[in-house]
């Protein structure tokens, strides 16, 4: 099986909430695509409810694009402790941190209908929790986001 970057991360050494550059790939044409780990909860000490992380996905997909150029995708982690974000290019981690903070502030203040929540727009449109999503955003902001360096497992 191919190596998976997140399986080499020592999840006991990172301290959420944080932004971490998880990797950079170069396309055959020479473009860079950067993947960021946008962690909200400490690994193995909790998980975001599926309805809340689904709502965070919808909100952060838009709000991160409002604050950072060239966002390709924002997707929830399977462990439900945060999101992955793919971006064209190699924005610096401090810039990504500022964009993530701004997007979380927007999420915490969101008081309108959740975007993309209809049977036509979403594959599970009934599974959302705006209140819980806003609470996770507020909690991460209250704890203070930081840039986290990658800590590899010692094997």
UniProtKB/Swiss-Prot annotation:
Its cofactor is Fe cation. Keywords: Autoinducer synthesis, Iron, Lyase, Metal-binding, Quorum sensing. Binds 1 Fe cation per subunit. It catalyses: S-(5-deoxy-D-ribos-5-yl)-L-homocysteine = (S)-4,5-dihydroxypentane-2,3-dione + L-homocysteine. One of its GO terms (biological process) is quorum sensing. One of its GO terms (molecular function) is S-ribosylhomocysteine lyase activity. Fe cation binds at residues 54, 58, 122. Its EC number is 4.4.1.21. Pfam families: LuxS (PF02664). Homodimer. Belongs to the LuxS family. NCBIfam families: PRK02260.2-4. Involved in the synthesis of autoinducer 2 (AI-2) which is secreted by bacteria and is used to communicate both the cell density and the metabolic potential of the environment. The regulation of gene expression in response to changes in cell density is called quorum sensing. Catalyzes the transformation of S-ribosylhomocysteine (RHC) to homocysteine (HC) and 4,5-dihydroxy-2,3-pentadione (DPD). This is S-ribosylhomocysteine lyase. It comes from Deinococcus deserti (strain DSM 17065 / CIP 109153 / LMG 22923 / VCD115).
């Amino acid at each position: 099986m191919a190596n998976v970057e997140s399986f080499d991360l020592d999840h006991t050494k990172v301290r959420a909430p944080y932004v971490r550059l998880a990797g950079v790939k170069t396309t055959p044409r020479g473009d860079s695509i950067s993947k960021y780990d946008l962690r909200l909860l400490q690994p193995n000490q909790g998980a975001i409810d599926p309805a809340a992380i689904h709502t965070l996905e919808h909100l952060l997909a838009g709000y991160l694009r409002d604050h950072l150029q060239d966002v390709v995708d924002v997707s929830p982690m399977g462990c439900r402790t945060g999101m992955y974000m793919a971006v064209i290019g190699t924005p610096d981690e401090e810039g990504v941190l500022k964009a993530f903070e701004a997007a979380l502030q927007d999420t915490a203040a969101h008081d309108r209908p959740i975007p993309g929540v209809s049977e036509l727009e979403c594959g599970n449109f009934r599974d959302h929790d705006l209140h819980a999503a806003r609470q996770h955003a507020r909690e991460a902001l209250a704890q203070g986001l930081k840039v986290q360096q990658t800590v590899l497992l010692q094997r």
